[in-house]
UniProtKB/Swiss-Prot annotation:
This is Homoserine O-acetyltransferase. Belongs to the AB hydrolase superfamily. MetX family. It comes from the Bacteria. Homodimer.
Length: 359
């Protein structure tokens, strides 16, 4: 079953944080489970940077499954026999929701370089419009990992009486200088690709080389040195090119870079990376404590101690800020060979924390 589609903001455009406006916004979304009679079991799932609206896919239709396939189903951490789950593709994405590759109704051409700047705050306001469209009066919980964790946090700030619980997996309240630096290098790889053309490449060749390189760097931040050592060590390829895929780890990264080209748009990657960099709960408030003090939801924060992207020190800072703001908080930390991506694949470790956070 493919994602469902709805067009929102058809009468009045959505005013964005940085001053842009978007109307006629297409939103791709999917639902799982059954909404109960009093509509009290709805849970919004917020996807990570390159995710989509379908965390679960029917094995009959797609053998690879969705990005949270092993976590979702009857009796699992994301229990479809108890909760009604909603997940939508984010604003600025390229998986069915309006983004830079979408057709601008004013020009009948892809937005490209004309697509406005988007923030996590804008993404959340579009999600709220979707929830209203679905006639859901209240959310039992909002859950997300990484970029999705930032969205979950913003939900609790913007709509404190609408959300009962927040589950934030592997995400701090703001991005670190080091992480912004990684994103800068990824952006430069794309922007300096000869095919980028200031983002207006849809009638020609896309900046595939730059996007592939960006993805390779990103993959290194999602993994751990121990994981790479176990998988590849210093093993070489039998016929590896001296300046290219000489080591097996290089071949793996090249494969991941090429694989990414078939499923993501370079402009969307640029916009969402910058939204990740810029996110700050204090936007629109005098300071971060004022923003966090609005949260009434019970907040579950989960950290992976050897996460290479959202470092433990930043999660500790986030924990302290939440506590100082009086947010009711459960905090967990533990190591995982999977590093930042643990929230997507390390079911045994994350299952009890997710289940507890949703209770």
């Amino acid at each position: 079953m493919s994602a469902q589609q709805v067009t929102l903001f058809t009468e009045q455009p959505l005013d964005l944080i940085f001053g842009g406006r978007l109307g006629q916004i297409d939103v791709a979304y999917q639902t799982y489970g059954t909404l109960n009679e009093d509509k009290s079991n709805a849970v919004l799932i917020c996807h990570a940077l390159t995710g989509d609206a379908e965390p679960y896919l029917s094995p009959v239709e797609n053998q690879a499954g969705g990005w949270w396939q092993s976590f979702m189903g009857e009796g699992l951490a994301l229990d479809t026999s108890r909760y009604f789950f909603i997940c939508s593709n984010v604003l600025g994405g390229c998986k069915g929701t309006t983004g830079p590759a979408s057709i601008n109704p004013k020009t009948n051409k892809p937005y490209g370089s004309q697509f406005p700047k988007v923030t996590v705050q804008d993404i959340v306001r579009l999600q709220k419009a979707l929830i209203s469209h679905l006639n859901i009066p209240h959310l039992h919980a909002v859950i997300g990992g990484s970029f999705g964790g930032m969205q979950a946090t913003q939900w609790a700030i913007y709509y404190p009486d609408f959300v009962d619980k927040v589950v934030n997996l592997c995400s701090s309240l703001t991005f670190s200088a080091e992480a912004i630096g990684f994103n800068h290098v990824m952006r430069q790889a794309i922007i300096n690709d000869p095919n980028f053309n200031n983002g207006d490449y849809y009638e020609g060749e896309p900046p595939e080389n730059g996007l592939s390189i960006a993805r390779m760097l990103g993959m290194l931040t999602y993994r751990t040195d121990l994981q790479l050592a176990k998988a590849f060590g210093r093993a070489t390829k039998n016929e590896g090119h001296y300046w290219g895929d000489y080591f097996q780890v290089e071949s793996y990264l090249s494969y991941q870079g090429q694989k990414f080209l078939g499923r993501f748009d370079a402009n969307s990657y640029l916009h969402l990376l910058r939204a990740l960099d810029i996110y700050d709960p204090s936007i629109g408030f005098d300071n971060i404590k004022e923003a966090l003090s609005r949260i009434k939801a019970h907040y579950t924060l989960v950290a992976v101690t050897n996460d290479q992207l959202f470092k433990l020190t930043d999660l500790h800072k986030s924990k302290t800020l939440l506590e100082q703001a009086g947010v009711p908080l459960d905090y967990y930390e533990f190591p995982s060979d999977y590093g930042h991506d643990a929230f997507l694949v390390d079911y045994d470790t994350f299952e009890p924390k997710i289940r507890s956070g949703l209770e």
